[in-house]
């Protein structure tokens, strides 16, 4: 159930934010049930990385791909969701098998004292702000879905929602400006400058030509190379710069490989980048933020423990994603 909740939340928010919310909750649930909280948290991290693939806003890599290739919110939803659901089912089966002994240890129930503490922690401090934010969030999602019909890019819906919420909630503007993640914004600007420079000097063209010679006119081979190649690299390389570097290469292949004009290689890139992040603890932002939270508790996530679950899940889900893209396209 927690995996499903995490996957759905990651599709609507993003996996980084979802794990910030889910990790403390799962820690308390694990303690209440008398089991190792990591038996809940690690599957949630894996589900968050996969669940976000199904929408434009679910992962930073999808946002990059969507903006570069002109793929909209509905396109991701239609072409990726079924594959994501299949991957989550396979992942759930493996996780159930892996943690079967741990989950059998769960205690008989929650003590009244702990239950009261959980209730206190779950108490909503500002219900007005909650329902206002929920309403605006719903309107933004509607804008994502319907905006494509009037050729409105998703950024317009997001900015309109943010503006409306600022006016409605009237927060401290100075505090809001301080809260903006300027480091990430500057990182993205610098990243695209570097990718553009590499493209201008011809290095990306050389890489694209080499991959084109390997793939030839075989679309299935192209999907395989992209999804498994990017997925393997994403286990150790941050998937955002990797995706940004791969975009011009995928664009070249989409024009040279017969049948690739359906944008299937972009979807393969999306799946490979996100699913590959499950391989190692350093493979994704959600992994690292979750590890950082658990580091402050008695149940920190170790590199080895994450690897034992994450690496098999990575290649199982990559295989499911590969088969789905072949069926879909």
Residue ranges of predicted features:
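Small-residue-rich segments of transmembrane alpha-helices in multi-pass membrane proteins
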Residues: 1, 44, 48-55, 113-121, ...
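Hydrophobic alpha-helical transmembrane segments
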Residues: 1-4, 18, 41-42, 77, ...
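Generic alpha-helical transmembrane segments of integral inner-membrane proteins
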Residues: 4, 8, 85-97, 134, ...
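Membrane-interfacial helix-loop connectors
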Residues: 9-45, 60-79, 181, 196-299
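Juxtamembrane and boundary regions of transmembrane helices in multi-pass small-molecule transporters
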Residues: 35-38, 42, 54-57, 74-125, ...
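Hydrophobic alpha-helical transmembrane segments in multi-pass integral membrane proteins
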Residues: 56-60, 139-145, 191-209, 276, ...
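Membrane-interface junctions of multi-pass transporters
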Residues: 117-122, 147-152, 167-222, 234
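Flexible hinge motifs at transmembrane-helix junctions and intramembrane kinks/re-entrant loops
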Residues: 127, 131, 139-159, 175
